[in-house]
Structure formats: C-alpha cells, structure tokens
C-alpha cells in the first residue's frame, strides 16, 4: 500500500473539501459543546478558519456510550486514552439517522499527538454507510493519504431508514497497523510507510474518534487491549 504525501495531494483534497462544503454546509447543533468528563475535541482547519468550533457540535454521555451530534468535521479524544507498542483499540459506531443526502465517514484514530494544536499527528480509519472504507491521517497538520476510499464487503450498508452499525478497530503490531471493520481487515499498512520523517511520529499516542461533518452517532465499547 503506497503512502502519498505531497502538496499536490493536499491541494486536491482541499479543493474537494471546499466543493463538498459548498454543496452541504456544516450544521450548527443547538446546545452544543462537550459535556463528557475528560474529553476534548478540535474541528478541522477549514472549519476553524470559518470561526467554527466543537461548540457547534454536541458530545454527551448516553446509555453507557457517547452520543454525538456533529456539525463540523473534527476529532475527539480523552488524553488518558493512550496506546503504545502492540495493541488493539476498537469501538462500535451506530449511525442513528442520516443528517444529509449522502454518506459521511466516522471511525477511530491512533498515534495522536499535538491534537489541540495546528500541527496534529494521527492516523484514522473510517467507514461509510455506503459500504466503503478509507485510511488517512495528518502529519504535522498535513494530509497523509494512506488508502483511497474503496468498497469493501465487510462494511455494512445503511438500511432504508439510514441506520447502520459498524465495529471499527485498529490492530497494531511490531511492523504494521491493520484497520478492521466488522472483524475483517480492510487495510493493512506497513509501519515503514506511515512512520518516519514527513510521516507520523509514531503509532504510539492518543487514540480517539474521527468524524466527518453532519453525522449523528452512538459510540460504545471504546476499549484498548
């Protein structure tokens, strides 16, 4: 799996992001903010430049899990949730309703550092309710395109009412990082392709939740072993 990191890619992604935002604006969730003890969040740079913050979304505890009503795309984390060496982190994501006319991704990130800065590092794997998966990240705030958005039979497709559930996990070993959706590896990334100069500092670090904009989710079973 080839890692792509270049200004051309970043520009292309930025253009795509701007086009998507023009088609569908980030919503502003009433009564927004983070009320889960210990948790933090940060919106993507494009949203931040528009004056948006995590207070335009809502993260709260509900039913033993995290209830998320997302406006701008963002990452959410608890600084005490860290993983080092060889590990597995996983969580179950239930998209409770569709807040737009096309699927938006959500999933887990690992290797997080400097998350509350303008130069975050992290690697994330996300699923779409249309049956696709994608692996991407940030290195010092710059986009790391690891694998393209591709269909995978392991990724559940949304029902007619828009609801869908996905279990998403990262399994990190000495030489690679695997993303699993519903128990099946959808991407296997050699560490040499994602760790080093101009890439991630490490797969060690904070783990947490990555969400696109305008999604409603219940997240349960966020665990590490």
List where the protein language model places each region.
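Bacterial N-terminal signal peptides that target proteins for export
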Residues: 1-8
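Carbohydrate-binding surfaces in secreted/extracellular proteins
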Residues: 160-194
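Low-complexity, Ser/Thr/Pro/Gly-rich disordered linker/stalk regions
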Residues: 21-99
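Hydrophobic h-region of N-terminal signal peptides that target proteins for export
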Residues: 9-19
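Flexible glycan-contacting loops in extracellular carbohydrate-active proteins
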Residues: 189-220
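Beta-strand-rich interaction surfaces with strong enrichment in secreted/lumenal proteins
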Residues: 75-81, 152-160, 208-209
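Short, aromatic/His-centered strand-loop micro-motif at the edge of beta-sheets
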Residues: 141-167
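Secretory/extracellular carbohydrate-interaction modules
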Residues: 70-142
